[in-house]
Amino acid sequence: MSGFYSHRSLDGVLTDGEITSIYKTGLHRSQKEADKKNLFTMQLTGGNVSYQQNRIRLGITGIYYVFNRPYEPQLTGYSQYNIHGNQFYNLGIDYAYRWHRFSFQGETAMGKQGSATLNRFQYSPVEGTQLMIVQRYYSYNYWAMFAHSFGEGSAVQNEQGYYLGVETSPFRYWHILASFDL
């Protein structure tokens, strides 16, 4: 079991007292960038509870975000499904199961609006060889500020697909990987 709390200032753009853009670079090279420094605050709190016994592992993770000003980005085009307001949350479960040469693991999460899931099934027919399939589904309206996951896009949002892979080491110092993404 673990928990956390954070209170920090963030960079961004304020328009009429509302956050319209959040900058994550941390760079302040010019006066224009310096003017966007520490304009609002964010508080985070959350935790994780995990259980493991023999071949099974289960966990629950939650995070709650609060901005001191409302977040109201311009909602046009691809960003029309982004979140807005000043309070957000994400709740997820993670799971894993191993049995002989098989393993299954994944995580499923939900937010204020959408959901996301990533699952992997792996089989090792012989020592040094692995076959795997990774399934992902990230709904168009899912949002998690600190999420990073396997996928084609840079955001954990609006994507679904399957990744198939074979990995083997037939000889010493040889490592062969073949994969494709559907």
Region annotations inferred by a language model:
Residues M1-R29, N38-F40, L44-N48:
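Aromatic- and glycine-enriched pocket-lining scaffold segments that form the walls
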